[in-house]
Amino acid sequence: MSTIAIVDYGMGNFHSVARALQHAAPDADIRICNRPEQIDAADRVVFPGQGAMPDCMRTLNESGLRAAVERAAASKPLMGVCVGEQMLFERSEEGGTPCLGIFPGEVRRFAGPQFADPVAADQAAAAPPAAARERLKVPHMGWNQVRQTRSHALWEGIPDGTHFYFVHSYYAAPSDPALTTGVTDYGVAFTCAVAAANIFAVQFHPEKSAEHGLRLYRNFVDWQP
C-alpha cells in the first residue's frame, strides 16, 4: 500500500485534499502530516497551499517542514497544488517573497489593462463604466480550460481541453519553457501545470474539479517517475 503524506504547515485545505485522495485512491494510505519524519517516511507527497505567499513561506519555515519538502522534491513523487505549486519557484511578486527555488522562475500577479484589479483603485476610478465591466476580475475564480502542452503520465485519461477549477491572483512563470505541461488563458496565457523528473504541480484545485480532478490524483498515486 502506497503511503501519501499531505504536508500540513497550517496554510492549506488539507482535509479537502485528503478526502479527494481517499475517494480517488481508496487503496492508498493517506496521512495529513505536520512532522518532518512523517514526510520522510511517506512514499509520495502532496504539497497544497492557499493564502498569501509571505504567510505561506513564513509558516512553512516556522513549522520546520521546509527541509522535509525539499528532501521529498529531490527523492520521491511530489505533487504541488495551488500555492504549493507557486512555492516551488524562486520568488513571488507578492511581497517580494523568496520561495523554495526548486524550479527556475517567478510568481507574477495578473496585471494589465485587461484586468479589473481591486488593488488598483485609481485604475477602477479612471475607467469608463463599460470598460470596467469588460475587464477580467482578479482573482481568477471558477472553471477554466487547460491545454496540455506536452504529454505526461498524470494527463492519462484526461482529455486535452478539460476544465479545472481555479482560485488565484498569481501564477507561476517558469524561466525554462520545458517545465510547462499545461496552459490556461485568462487575459494572458499562463502556465497552470509544470512537471520535471519526480515533480508534477498545478495551479488549479484537483479536489474541486470533479471527476477529472480525481483522475489526476489517481494518476499521481499510480505514477512511477
Curated annotation (Swiss-Prot):
GO terms for molecular function: glutaminase activity; imidazoleglycerol-phosphate synthase activity; lyase activity. It comes from the Bacteria. Keywords: Amino-acid biosynthesis, Cytoplasm, Glutamine amidotransferase, Histidine biosynthesis, Hydrolase, Lyase. Its EC number is 4.3.2.10, 3.5.1.2. The keyword Hydrolase applies. It catalyses: 5-[(5-phospho-1-deoxy-D-ribulos-1-ylimino)methylamino]-1-(5-phospho-beta-D-ribosyl)imidazole-4-carboxamide + L-glutamine = D-erythro-1-(imidazol-4-yl)glycerol 3-phosphate + 5-amino-1-(5-phospho-beta-D-ribosyl)imidazole-4-carboxamide + L-glutamate + H(+); L-glutamine + H2O = L-glutamate + NH4(+). SUPFAM superfamilies: Class I glutamine amidotransferase-like. PROSITE patterns: GATASE_TYPE_1. It is found in: Cytoplasm. The active site is at residues 82, 205, 207. Residues 3-225 form the Glutamine amidotransferase type-1 domain. InterPro entries: Class_I_gatase-like, GATASE, Imidazole-glycPsynth_HisH. Its main location: cytoplasm. IGPS catalyzes the conversion of PRFAR and glutamine to IGP, AICAR and glutamate. The HisH subunit catalyzes the hydrolysis of glutamine to glutamate and ammonia as part of the synthesis of IGP and AICAR. The resulting ammonia molecule is channeled to the active site of HisF. This is Imidazole glycerol phosphate synthase subunit HisH. It comes from Bordetella pertussis (strain Tohama I / ATCC BAA-589 / NCTC 13251). The gene is hisH.
